[in-house]
Amino acid sequence: MAGKIADVEKVILTASGGPFRDVKDLAEVSLADALNHPTWNMGPVVTINSATLVNKGLEIIEAHYLFDIPYNKIEAVIHPQSVVHSMVEFKDGSTIAQASPPNMKGPIAYAIAHPDRIAQAMPAIDWKSAHAWSFAPIDHERFPAVELAKRCGALGGAVAAMYNAANEVAVAAFMKEEIPFTAIVDTIEKTVTTLGGQAQSVVRDMKDVSAIENDARRVAQEALAKR
């Protein structure tokens, strides 16, 4: 974006779609299925967040705060190859894409060395080889986490923190195989519906955020206990 936020029409984040982008019955998927990511090698919690697309919801919230971009200008699309990681569309119709192999070495090196770049931080894309990149819209009925994150973020206050806290509780339960996969995002939505008004209040400091997070964890655990 080069600091020219006024020229930005939209920011597009990409999601691999996780292991379930083509699976019809998400209620029947197992923990082992969820941990079998097709393109990334990550820890278990992040891998499950990728499967639910909660990770993309969190990235949308992060982009909003890091770059002061309105939520209605941030989108996410499915990109199974995980090579194009984000794009910025400008008001003149042009788009700049950030592309690299699915490897966290590059982003970590860039964060450490910014504004400089570390030589050969990771292998570059071989542009002489044939590549097929595809993009598709997210099916928000099957994967409601992204739109839910945008709604939470738009509500303001600490609702986004509530989204994250409820997710952590639900993912922990799924990893213990206590709940089905589809219950993860259901639990987040129930928590936000129950406490969203409270979390919209003005956040003065980290004590306020911690209190709201604790309330969200409690309500999420209560919702899971009622299943």
Stretches with model-predicted labels:
Residues M1-R227:
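Catalytic, metal-anchored helix/loop core of enzyme active sites in primary metabolism
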